[in-house]
């Protein structure tokens, strides 16, 4: 899905432009070529992916071409949400760069998963890891740039989770504009960005309010001429409603997690995250709640989905992009279930699994950070 734009009227298949960029991939011992542009065209309704003659097994029907997303740039391989991680993902070949956004005290959009500096990642000028997080809304960009985020804190739980991550000391937190510059330098005119607003309604003091946050992001996207290359995701649905009103051309991706302790949605009661669109109002159905809110894509925790919920989302015209899947067995199972895309810390493994399923892969766009 690079990424997809799904029209409200199902049943019509169209692509907005000809296939003008090919990439060579290997599937079942055969070479398969695909146009990267084919997966970036505007999709007006239901697009059913057909199997290639050399495909090892018939693929399930999807609403859109499969979307291979590098979570935080592929944090199992390079420092997360940094120019090195995004450059590595582009050089490897992905459909979408997934990343997160915060806004500094002086109004600059920066790329970071937390709402502030992460003690497991950020080292000050003295070389020591910070002891507590500091929200970006309390720091200027100049202050943020003083911190080194190129190496996980040794012997931390985070380091144990990603033992293969290549440390790159001296790496700084990038601005979103710097990521756009990297994408331009790569020459990849088809890769898209799935950008998340990091706002927590239960901690309103740790970020801008939703309206101010969205305004900053949309102003930057328009100034950089990137509105056509992004989709905006969030667990805080208030921000997505604002995006839909102010920039309806940008697809909104509704993130959900039902599992404790970090759930943002409940099937039987209201949640501060869902802006009043609680599943309890829609027969306990998360896809119906997303559709009612105006969502274009549903992005659930992969453990939360079933074949039934995927089918229900597809009937509603909602592609399903699951997160965060790092085990090849889970990747294979979810692809067979018919998900429309996978967000992964291991885009390299996801490429291998997808190729084995006969899914055409995006071509590489080598670039240095």
Segments and roles (model prediction):
Residues 1-33:
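N-terminal secretory signal peptides that target proteins for export/translocation
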Residues 9, 46-47, 315:
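N-terminal secretion targeting segments of exported proteins
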Residues 21, 26, 33, 38, ...:
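Phosphate-group recognition and catalysis centered on beta-loop-alpha active-site segments
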Residues 39-47:
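Bacterial N-terminal signal peptides
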